[in-house]
Every structure is written in structure tokens, then in C-alpha cells.
């Protein structure tokens, strides 16, 4: 949604993943320093696994941590950031668009909160809330823990929001049952990971759930 033009008077980005939030904050407030840090990095298997081994190392600055996390995102296979992707990527090309992202984030509030705590602060009658929780049944692939109870808790919280919400989920019986009282649309999406490594389209079903 941040790739679209800014239309709202106020925008809030929230993620429970502290490393992702740190990356966004560094792009917003220290973009030049982050790009400089990244300019010394290479796309290689050895460096990738070096960053993996340093993942929880203390003593790094926020910029150093953000640069390593950025490289793990861009050069990994899948979303676990633990397996090298063997994909040809030019680091300088990857970092060029960070300046555009910095400009886009200039007036965005960046938070690192549990969804329930966040909505207590920002849910208003004129709010439009987009939520992208972990797909049900795939939680082990995410760094931030999200349990079955959290999926249920999210649904209960959304039943009482004042604003409008849009929720994207994987298409499964559990999710359809949980949100049966809301508007559910099924859409087809390209499987970007499969398309990246194979010269063919791979599609899967996703649910778009709304309270309006």
C-alpha cells in the first residue's frame, strides 16, 4: 500500500518484527548512512551466512543491523532469511530506490506494537486499517511468534473496530470459518518465489476480508 500515492492525512506503519521496523526507521531517518553501509557489502554465499551467524550479535549499531537485515531479505531464498538464494543481484541497484522510500516515509508514523495495542491508539471512525498477519499454518516461517490463539484474538479485536478494515489471509477452512460474518473475496496471486526460480507462473488463492 505504501507504493501508492499518499492520500490520507495520517499514515501508520506497524510491524511486530523489530528488525523490519528498525530497517524502516533507518531508511526514514538515516538513509544516506544506510546506503553507505550497504555499499561495502557484496552478494555472496559466505557473506550471507556470516550475516546469519551475526543475527543476534550485540554491539551493532542500528544502521549496521539494518544493513545486514536488508541483505538477508534481498539475497535469501524464501522468507526465513536463513537460506542463500543464489540469485544474481547488484547491491548498488538494490539500494538506489531507498531514497524514494525515504521520501515516501517522511510523514509516516512507524510503530512496533502488538496489533491490539496499536488499534487502541489509532482506530478511529474514519480509519482504514490494512492487516497482513502470518498465513495460518505457516507461522514457523516468521521471525515474530504468532499462535493460533493470536489468529482468534485478531478476529475478536476486528469485530469491534470503529474504522474500516481490509485483511489479507491464506485461503483455508480455519480462516473462512473465523471470518464467516464478514465480506470475503477470493483472489488469485502469483507465487513470486516460485516464479523467481522457475520460468513459469505459479498462482495461489488468497482471501481479502472486509467489514464493509
Predicted regions and their residues:
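Conserved SAM-binding motif I beta-strand of class I
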Residues: 10-15
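Short alpha-helix immediately C-terminal to the canonical SAM-binding loop
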Residues: 21
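A short helix-to-beta-strand connector/capping loop
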Residues: 9, 103-108, 180-182
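Conserved SAM-binding loop
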Residues: 24
Amino acid at each position: 500500500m505504501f507504493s501508492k500515492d499518499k492520500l490520507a492525512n495520517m499514515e501508520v506503519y506497524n510491524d511486530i518484527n523489530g528488525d523490519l521496523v528498525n530497517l524502516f526507521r533507518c531508511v526514514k531517518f538515516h538513509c544516506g548512512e544506510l546506503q553507505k553501509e550497504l555499499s561495502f557489502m557484496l552478494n555472496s554465499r559466505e557473506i550471507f551466512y556470516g550475516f546469519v551467524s551475526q543475527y543476534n550479535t550485540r554491539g551493532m549499531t542500528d544502521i549496521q543491523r539494518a544493513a545486514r537485515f536488508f541483505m538477508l531479505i534481498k539475497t535469501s531464498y524464501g522468507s526465513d532469511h536463513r537460506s542463500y538464494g543464489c540469485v544474481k543481484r547488484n547491491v548498488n541497484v538494490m539500494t538506489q530506490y531507498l531514497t524514494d522510500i525515504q521520501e515516501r516515509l517522511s510523514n509516516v508514523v512507524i510503530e512496533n506494537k502488538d496489533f491490539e495495542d496499536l488499534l487502541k491508539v489509532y482506530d478511529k471512525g474514519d480509519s482504514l486499517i490494512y492487516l497482513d498477519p502470518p498465513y495460518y499454518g505457516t507461522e514457523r516461517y516468521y521471525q515474530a511468534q504468532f499462535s493460533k490463539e493470536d489468529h482468534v484474538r485478531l478476529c475478536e479485536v476486528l469485530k469491534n473496530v470503529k474504522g474500516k478494515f481490509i485483511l489479507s489471509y491464506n485461503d483455508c477452512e480455519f480462516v473462512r470459518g473465523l471470518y464467516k460474518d464478514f465480506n470475503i473475496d477470493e483472489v488469485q496471486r502469483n507465487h513470486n518465489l516460485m516464479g523467481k526460480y522457475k520460468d513459469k507462473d505459479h498462482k495461489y488463492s488468497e482471501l481479502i476480508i472486509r467489514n464493509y
